[in-house]
Design a protein with these regions (language model features):
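Aromatic sugar-binding surface patches on proteins
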Residues: 812-816
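N-terminal processing/targeting junctions
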Residues: 16-19, 587, 778
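Bacterial Sec-dependent N-terminal signal peptides
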Residues: 6-27
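Catalytic-domain carbohydrate-binding cleft regions of carbohydrate-active enzymes
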Residues: 125-674, 679-680
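Short, small-residue-biased leader/transition segments that mark boundaries at the very start
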Residues: 1-5, 450
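Solvent-exposed, conformationally flexible loop/turn segments
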Residues: 637, 662-663, 822-831
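N-terminal accessory segment at the very beginning of proteins
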Residues: 22-263, 270-272, 276-285, 296, ...
Length: 835
């Protein structure tokens, strides 16, 4: 009898387990639905529910709730607006086997048994679908989504990740991790941005802050998956005609990037132990003595007396206010680091924070968590999710601002030493939740406080903050850098690590980190033989010149200033840096576009050429804006570079006259003093004179290089300008100067459009200079129908920064250029160059 009872119990237990197991591995059947304005909720026979909310005609929020409660612990840290446009009242068309919802751009089909979601475009092309009967699975707190994987589908995104840009065949985790000297295949890294895009013209943003995972065909060639170990399974499907449109809608959800001060787009110098007044003066004088442009000098963490009292270290800084004023007079801004902790050695501040309850708690004992830290001893971790902390921290960080610093770099915000293997950190309890939920957004909450307190206490001043650890939405508060990139055991052999930074930077841009940099020279490794590293250093600087926030940085007291690597390396580094400064009007115009759309300055090739599958694997080159193609040399000893040119005609930017047809791979010469670059035919590139620093001259002549389009076509560019340091760009205080060049069978018609923007004006007069690259020289030039005086190049350039009454032109057949000088009066002018 006991045997029968036992066997019967085992039988029912096995059956129950089988039913339970089945429930976890199959999505239930849809039995009913309810609708409310934008949302439709579908109820399944396993007690789960799935809600679709139309954010716009092309964006759908999908919420899988295993218990049907649709409750979340915290509002979204990333999404600031999900009602993107009026979609009216959602109408559900019920049929025998499915439900359908239509928008002007999408057809959404929900099959009933089992629940299976499919999304089509308006032309009935299937874009996205649940995989078979396991689209939505739960197992305890763990939730998984399985989606159909097409044979020709490719994936891009997930923010700052190593490896190839095409994510297909790879798996990734989101867990902000301190990975010093990380390799070319390291994951996870410092930032978590669970947003990716498919070549089927959709994007997915998983709005979950836990340690989520993404597997793009690593488990099966038939499906890909994403999962979360806790929290809610909420994600947004975003449809667009191309990647740019998808990214713009993601920005609409998560907020526009702030614009950096213009000076931040120049060059910056740093090193790990750049933490003294004496060294700061030496570096500043070294740059100015040699005429190498530089705008920013960083001070690393050792600038403080203690973490994080924001007091200048005694003995290192005799008179920091005077130092900052002197450096400002030399054209330098100073940026200092901050860590998100209070050292226990900093007794007064630690006791204050502990007494006020401003430190993250240890859930096992209720006391402030005792956090080991890479320097400064054990620390308390500041709880930036607690609202009262903001003003307290803001008052401390204001002290060096009042002394004269220009900004911060927020370092170690993972927080450091809390990588996924360090599970003992999970006992940390923040005001808004346990550490498994808050870890990935910890840096984001800190960045938010730093930015908002900066603006609160420094009205109308543009914040500069560069961060290492963050989450989706960071673009609202901060800028980025790619952390402590490695060089390997031998710093002179760090070629692979340098090459790796190109896809890492491009990947960051796809995660809406348009303003970023790597540690130029690589963070790790002692440099014992500077001549032996001269070639690698040169190539680092050449690649780094196209980082939006170019910063030279290295660990410890390893000096990495350009003049230390030999005369040739210094000369080549200076040339690369000067190129960036000449391009600043172009760069700043694209900085405005980044603010408006989220599009990065450094762009993967497929962002501009989404239909060209060859661009999916071009990880060693990139577009810089829409007009310039850059292919840095990243191999030791290489004096040429294999480059892919997409559709169109491409002109070698290093000689301005050699043209190549697109849609081909080609090998181009790349001696040590050359960065392989191409400009697309039909482009206008605005430039400024090289300066020691970006605002050395408040007003200057702008030169427009024009590479005319083919006959019958026109070339356009709209130059963007503003004050560069204030928040006027948010209030419409900026101006645009539209330039158009039309190619005809008689010559070229250049139109300088009326300057737009009444709220901002130039601080002085200037000349506009034009350089048209052409093989056929015009014989006559007319300004608004009147003949223009012809002159020589010397006269054309004479007094161009002080004399604003001369209009003249100069055809130069030898150089293949047609030059024009025109005083900038802000009015429309038509210039005809006639053969």
């Amino acid at each position: 009898r006991q045997m029968c009872i036992r066997d019967r119990f085992l039988f029912f237990a096995v059956c129950a387990f089988s039913v339970y197991a089945n429930a976890q591995n199959r999505t239930g059947d849809c039995t009913s639905y309810t609708s409310d304005d934008r949302s439709v909720t579908f109820y399944l026979n396993d007690s789960s529910a799935i809600q679709l909310r139309l954010c716009s005609q092309s964006t759908v929020r999908i919420w899988f709730s295993p218990d049907g409660s649709f409750q979340r612990n915290n509002p979204s840290f990333a999404v600031v607006n999900e009602d993107l446009e009026d979609v009216g009242t959602v109408h559900v068309d019920e049929q025998n086997a499915c439900y359908e919802i239509f928008t002007p751009k999408l057809r959404i089909r929900v099959n009933k048994s089992p629940f299976n979601l499919q999304i089509f475009d308006k032309y009935q092309k299937l874009l996205f679908s649940d995989y078979a009967d396991k689209g939505h699975i739960s197992n305890g707190q763990r939730k998984l989504e399985y989606k159909t994987l097409r044979r020709d589908e490719h994936f891009f995104g997930l923010g700052e990740k190593t490896g190839k840009l095409d994510r297909r065949g790879e798996a990734y985790k989101m867990w902000n991790s301190d990975k010093p000297c990380y390799s070319a295949v390291e994951d996870p890294l410092y930032k978590s941005i669970p947003f990716f895009m498919s070549s089927y013209r959709y994007g997915i943003f998983l709005d979950n802050t836990y340690k989520t995972e993404f597997k793009f065909g690593t488990e099966s060639r038939d499906y890909y998956s994403f999962e979360a170990p806790g929290g809610e399974m909420i994600y947004y499907f975003i449809f667009g005609k191309d990647y740019k449109e998808i990214m713009k809608q993601y920005v609409d959800l998560t907020g526009k990037p702030i614009m950096p001060p213009k000076w931040a787009l120049g060059f910056a110098q740093c090193r790990g132990l750049l933490t003294s007044e004496k060294l700061s003066y030496e570096i500043a004088e070294g740059y100015r003595k040699r005429g190498i442009p530089c705008d920013v000098i960083y001070q690393d963490i050792g600038w403080t007396q203690y973490l994080q009292d924001f007091e200048w270290r005694k003995g290192n800084y005799e008179n920091p206010k005077k130092m900052l004023a002197d450096l400002k007079d030399m054209g330098f801004k100073v940026v200092v680091s901050q860590d998100p902790v209070i050292s226990q050695a900093n007794k007064r501040q630690w006791e204050e924070a502990d007494r006020l309850g401003y430190l993250v708690k240890d859930s096992t004992n209720g006391r402030s968590y005792d956090m080991p830290w890479p320097w400064g001893g054990n620390c308390g971790v500041v709880d930036f999710t607690l609202p009262a902390v903001a003003d307290w921290w803001g008052a401390y960080q204001q002290k060096p601002i009042d002394d004269g610093i220009a900004g911060f770099w927020t370092d170690m915000g993972e927080p450091a030493w809390s990588n996924e293997e360090q599970t003992e950190r999970l006992v940390m309890k923040h005001h808004l939740g346990m550490h498994d939920e808050i870890h990935n957004v910890y840096g984001l909450t800190w960045d938010k406080v730093v930015k908002e307190q900066f603006e609160k206490r420094n009205p109308n001043r543009r914040v500069f903050q560069m961060t290492r650890a963050a989450f989706a939405g960071l673009q609202r508060y901060t800028f980025g850098w790619t952390g402590d990139c490695g060089n390997g055991d031998d710093v002179t052999q760090g070629w692979g690590q340098m090459a790796n930074q190109i896809p890492v930077l491009l990947s960051a841009g796809l995660g809406i980190i348009p303003f970023t940099t790597c540690d130029i020279t690589g963070y790790c490794g002692d440099i014992e033989d500077y001549p032996a590293m001269a070639e690698l250093y040169t190539r680092w600087i050449q690649m780094g010149a196209f980082n939006p926030l170019s910063r030279i940085h290295h660990e410890g007291n390893v000096a990495v200033e350009p003049w230390l690597f030999g005369e040739e390396a210094e000369k080549n580094a200076k040339a690369a840096i000067e190129l960036k400064y000449r391009l600043l009007p172009y760069i700043y115009t694209y900085a405005r576009e980044a603010h408006e759309t989220g599009l990065p300055l450094m762009r993967p090739m497929f962002l501009e050429y989404p239909a060209d599958m060859e661009t999916f694997s071009t990880d060693a080159q990139f577009m810089f804006g829409s007009e310039l193609l850059v292919a840095p040399v990243v191999k030791k000893g290489a004096r040429n570079k294999n480059v892919y040119l997409p559709e169109g005609t491409w002109i070698d930017y290093n000689n301005k006259h050699t043209a190549y047809s697109g849609e081909q791979w080609m090998t181009v010469d790349a001696p040590l003093n050359t960065i392989p670059m191409f400009v697309k035919q039909g482009s206008i590139i605005p430039q400024m004179p090289v300066m020691n620093y970006t605002d050395e001259k408040p007003v200057y002549p702008v030169t427009f290089e024009i590479f005319p389009a083919a006959a019958g076509s026109e070339t356009t560019f709209s130059l963007y300008e503003d004050a560069g340091t204030d928040l006027g760009y948010l209030r419409g205080e900026f101006m645009r100067t539209p330039i158009t060049c039309q190619t005809t069978d008689k010559g070229y018609t250049l139109k300088v459009g009326t300057r737009t923007g009444e709220k901002y004006s130039l601080p002085g007069q200037r000349n506009l200079m034009f350089c048209i690259y052409t093989e056929q020289m015009p014989r006559t030039a007319l300004l608004d129908g009147q003949k223009i005086k012809k002159t020589n190049v010397g006269k054309l350039e004479e007094n161009r920064e002080t004399e604003f009454t001369i209009t003249a032109w100069c055809p130069d057949k030898k150089l293949g250029t047609c030059l024009l000088r025109l005083p900038d009066d802000g009015k429309e002018h038509i210039i005809e160059f006639i053969y």
